[in-house]
C-alpha cells in the first residue's frame, strides 16, 4: 500500500483514513464512529506510532491522550472516564513510567499519588479513601514497600504503623 487509504461504513460515513508509504503506515491515522465522531487519532512514522495519540468516547469526551516516540510511550499520558473525569495521569520515558503518577476515583478524589523510576515505584506513596482522607503513607524502594508505613481509618484516624524491611 502507498498513499491515503479510506474505509467507509454502509451509511457512507468515513470509518478509517490512514496514510501508507512503502507498505507501512506513515502519517496520520484517524478512526471514526458510525456517527462521524472521531474515535482514535495517531501519527505513524515508518510503521511505528510517533507523536500524539488520542482516543475518544462516542460522546466526544477524551478517553486517552499520550505521546509516542517511534513505538515507545514517551511523554505525558492521561486516561479519562466517559464523563470527562481524569482516571490516571503521568509521564513515560522510554516506555517506562517515570516521575509522579496520579490515579483518581470516579468522584474525582485522588486515589493514589506514586513516584516511579524506570517503571518501578520509588519514593513516597500516598493512598486515599474516596472521601479524600489519607489511607496509607509510605515509601517504595525498587517497587517494594520499605521503611515506616502509616495506615489510617476511613475517618482519618490513625490506625497503625508497619515497618517493611527487605531483609
Q: Which residues does each PLM region occupy?
A:
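Glycine/tyrosine- and acidic-biased, solvent-exposed loop/turn segments at the edges of beta-strands
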Residues: 1-167
Amino acid at each position: 500500500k502507498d498513499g491515503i487509504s479510506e474505509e467507509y461504513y454502509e451509511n457512507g460515513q468515513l470509518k478509517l483514513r490512514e496514510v501508507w508509504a512503502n507498505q507501512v503506515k506513515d502519517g496520520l491515522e484517524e478512526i471514526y464512529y458510525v456517527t462521524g465522531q472521531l474515535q482514535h487519532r495517531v501519527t505513524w512514522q515508518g510503521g511505528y506510532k510517533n507523536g500524539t495519540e488520542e482516543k475518544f468516547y462516542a460522546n466526544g469526551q477524551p478517553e486517552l491522550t499520550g505521546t509516542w516516540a517511534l513505538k515507545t510511550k514517551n511523554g505525558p499520558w492521561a486516561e479519562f472516564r466517559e464523563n470527562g473525569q481524569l482516571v490516571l495521569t503521568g509521564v513515560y520515558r522510554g516506555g517506562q513510567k517515570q516521575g509522579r503518577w496520579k490515579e483518581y476515583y470516579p468522584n474525582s478524589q485522588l486515589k493514589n499519588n506514586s513516584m516511579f523510576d524506570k517503571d518501578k515505584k520509588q519514593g513516597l506513596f500516598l493512598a486515599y479513601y474516596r472521601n479524600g482522607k489519607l489511607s496509607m503513607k509510605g515509601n517504595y524502594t525498587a517497587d517494594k514497600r520499605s521503611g515506616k508505613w502509616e495506615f489510617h481509618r476511613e475517618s482519618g484516624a490513625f490506625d497503625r504503623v508497619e515497618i517493611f524491611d527487605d531483609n
